[in-house]
Amino acid sequence: MAKLLQPPPKFLPSEWHIANKNQYHRADAQRSRSERLVAESQRLVDEIEKTTRKSQSDVNKKLEQRLEEVQFWKKELDDKLEQLVNVTDDLLIYKIRLEKALETLKEPLHITETCLAYREKRIGIDLVHDTVEHELIKEAEIIQGIMALLTRTLEEASEQIRMNRSAKYNLEKDLKDKFVALTIDDICFSLNNNSPNIRYSENAVRIEPNSVSLEDWLDFSSTNVEKADKQRNNSLMLKALVDRILSQTANDLRKQCDVVDTAFKNGLKDTKDARDKLADHLAKVMEEIASQEKNITALEKAILDQEGPAKVAHTRLETRTHRPNVELCRDVAQYRLMKEVQEITHNVARLKETLAQAQAELKGLHRRQLALQEEIQVKENTIYIDEVLCMQMRKSIPLRDGEDHGVWAGGLRPDAVC
């Protein structure tokens, strides 16, 4: 216990001075290190603050550039969308024009086919494959060809409208995404260090697995623009094609209509001329019938007129047979009476032969009269079919519209049918 209570060892003055100096040196060294650290820390703080400001400024510029780039593509898409919508609206109008043109063609085709059916009711020799029938068949073929062409063009227009709507959908979807992207980037661009809604986000520094590269992004929008341009150009070409088709087909059909009408007029003229000539011949035959009937009457009278002289001659001859004895002489009178009877008999035979010929000729004239009357009826039937039924009906074919230089009732232009 006494050992534990021993006083601490005493140091020498030199040791005391050395210990103090050591403390001074360590304090100076510690302070120097601290001062250097403070200075280094300040430089680090300044450097990082400067770097952060520069980085944030650079990010702001990049966001601003991105906003401008997205805005540029959004405007491009907006312009293409507007153009595509306008040309699609035009195509819808053209589609209606094609539909109306097809509907309008039904009447001319019906009229042409009806004319052909009517003309099948011609009779006799008039049931001929003439120029009118040839041109009517050609007109029907032209109309059917035009309808087939318009139907194909209508299908092309419908398909083009579908393609336009598909491109429009892609543009609208791209525009919608870009609008959202612009909104998001605009919010990001407006953020600053004093914004109230800034916060730390867990795992913010990451690449989304479904993200695309800038090149892919540019290709996507560029492809949408190119597709829209392609469909717009296709639509413009289709519009020009429809205009040409409607113009050319209407012009072709109008020309054929004129050809058919001219054929009808020429055919009617020929038929009427033939009818008039037949009527002239009928009139002459009727005159000849009347003349022949008078001739027959005269011949019959002449034959009847021979009965008196014949009876007289016969009576004289028979009476002279009663002369007595030698008076029953073959004298000159007897021979002359016999010759008279022979002459009368011969003349009556000649008259009867001529009468038979006249009666046969009269029958022939009556047969010719009936044939001419029947043929005139054939011509009248043809004239009625062509002039009354066909040509009157053809007047209802849609005509040229003077104000629009040939607009069809159904919208076909620039030339109408007839």
Swiss-Prot record:
PANTHER family reported in the protein's UniProt record: TEKTIN (PTHR19960), TEKTIN-1 (PTHR19960:SF25)
Family: Belongs to the tektin family.
Source species: Homo sapiens (Human)
Record's function text: Microtubule inner protein (MIP) part of the dynein-decorated doublet microtubules (DMTs) in cilia and flagellar axoneme. Forms filamentous polymers in the walls of ciliary and flagellar microtubules.
Domain of life: Eukaryota
Protein localization: Cytoplasm, Cytoskeleton, Cilium axoneme; Cytoplasm, Cytoskeleton, Flagellum axoneme
Protein name: Tektin-1
Entry GO CC: axonemal A tubule inner sheath; axonemal microtubule; microtubule cytoskeleton; nucleus; sperm flagellum
Protein keywords: Cell projection, Cilium, Coiled coil, Cytoplasm, Cytoskeleton, Flagellum, Microtubule, Ubl conjugation
Database matches in Pfam families: Tektin (PF03148)
GO biological process, one term: cilium assembly
Transmembrane segments: none
InterPro entries (alphabetical): Tektin-like, Tektins
Post-translational modification: Ubiquitinated, leading to its degradation. Deubiquitinated by USP16, promoting its stability.
Coiled coil segments of this chain: 21-107, 134-177, 266-308, 333-384
Tissue-wise expression: Predominantly expressed in testis. Expressed in airway epithelial cells.
SUBUNIT field: Microtubule inner protein component of sperm flagellar doublet microtubules.
